[in-house]
């Protein structure tokens, strides 16, 4: 079975280094002329799939914006996942789950077991209960060719108080996470399947990312304030592993399908230039 890291490397090579979020928050639905209800949600998600599913490497639905409509919203999420995967995009579900024991194993099954209606290519997780507590996620991902992205240095300013705090051995909390994920990915080729979330807004990290040997998801671009040029400052020698992530900057171009594609093409060109220096 092809690993997630290998699939991601292949699809990014084919489609380019870009992840686009599906974040149907009320203000964006209104901007698109849609009602803030399940019908509006379904039309929004369907339009994004039509516009980008066959051309963007990774699409990242934010689960909360579907969950807020209850079971009908989750049904739309399930349908969106199926459509995206059929169109050839890798689906990264933004859920930021984190727990222990049988509970984290249940989360793993919900998102990474092929028999689940919410089965996706990868998920985001929180390491606050300890990176080791996420072992069921890592194990099922490895068994099923899935991926996991662990929060490390996030784009929100509140995160620094925890992530840059020092542990007993002098490392920051973020560095501890980085080191443990580096061990999980050791020896993987062409890329490990456990990635990190590192915000594009944070400037020079002061942390060593080159040894991670896994994908580095970079949110915070566009509406959150970072530009593609900031990627070189944040990631330095780790640029080849970076997966830039845009949401509102692309989605604001909707609901016109052609305009959405044009917005995605523009930010992809910016990302290529930033990551390659050309």
Swiss-Prot record:
UniProt catalytic activity: orotidine 5'-phosphate + H(+) = UMP + CO2
EC annotation from Swiss-Prot or TrEMBL: 4.1.1.23
A family per Pfam: OMPdecase
Positions annotated as active site in the UniProt record: 96 (proton donor)
Keyword entries, A-Z: Decarboxylase, Lyase, Pyrimidine biosynthesis
Cross-referenced CDD domains: OMP_decarboxylase_like (cd04725)
Enzyme class per UniProt: lyase
Entry GO MF terms: orotidine-5'-phosphate decarboxylase activity
BP GO terms, sorted: 'de novo' pyrimidine nucleobase biosynthetic process; 'de novo' UMP biosynthetic process
Pathways involved: Pyrimidine metabolism; UMP biosynthesis via de novo pathway; UMP from orotate: step 2/2
Alphabetized InterPro entries for the sequence: Aldolase_TIM (IPR013785), OMPdecase_AS (IPR018089), OMPdecase_type-2 (IPR011995), OMPdeCOase_dom (IPR001754), RibuloseP-bd_barrel (IPR011060)
Recorded superkingdom: Bacteria
HAMAP family referenced in this protein's UniProt entry, alphabetically: OMPdecase_type2 (MF_01215)
Similarity field: Belongs to the OMP decarboxylase family. Type 2 subfamily.
Name this protein carries in UniProt: Orotidine 5'-phosphate decarboxylase
Organism: Salinispora tropica (strain ATCC BAA-916 / DSM 44818 / JCM 13857 / NBRC 105044 / CNB-440)
């Amino acid at each position: 079975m092809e690993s997630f890291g290998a699939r991601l490397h292949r699809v990014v090579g084919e489609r380019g280094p870009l992840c686009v979020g599906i974040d149907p928050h009320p203000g964006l639905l209104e901007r698109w002329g849609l009602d803030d209800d399940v019908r509006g949600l379904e039309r929004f998600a369907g339009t994004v799939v039509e516009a980008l599913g066959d051309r963007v490497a990774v699409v990242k639905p934010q689960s909360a914006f579907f969950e807020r409509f209850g079971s009908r919203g989750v049904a739309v999420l399930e349908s969106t996942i199926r459509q995206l995967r059929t169109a050839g995009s890798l689906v990264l579900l933004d859920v930021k789950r984190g727990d222990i024991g049988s509970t984290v194993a249940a989360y793993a099954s919900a998102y990474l077991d092929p028999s689940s209606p919410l089965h996706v290519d990868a998920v985001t997780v929180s390491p606050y209960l300890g990176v080791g507590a996420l072992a069921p996620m890592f194990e099922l991902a490895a068994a099923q060719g899935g991926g996991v992205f662990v929060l490390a240095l996030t784009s929100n300013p509140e995160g620094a108080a925890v992530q840059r705090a020092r542990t007993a051995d002098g490392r920051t909390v973020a560095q501890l996470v980085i080191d443990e994920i580096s061990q999980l990915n050791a020896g993987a080729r062409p890329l490990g399947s456990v990635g990190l979330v590192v915000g594009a807004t944070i400037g020079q990290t002061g942390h060593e990312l080159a040894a991670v040997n896994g994908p580095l998801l970079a949110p915070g671009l566009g509406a959150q304030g970072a530009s593609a040029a900031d990627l070189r400052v944040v990631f330095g020698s780790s640029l080849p592993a970076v997966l830039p992530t845009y949401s509102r900057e692309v989605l604001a171009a909707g609901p016109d399908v052609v305009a959405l594609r044009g917005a995605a093409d523009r930010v992809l060109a910016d990302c290529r230039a930033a990551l390659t220096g050309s």
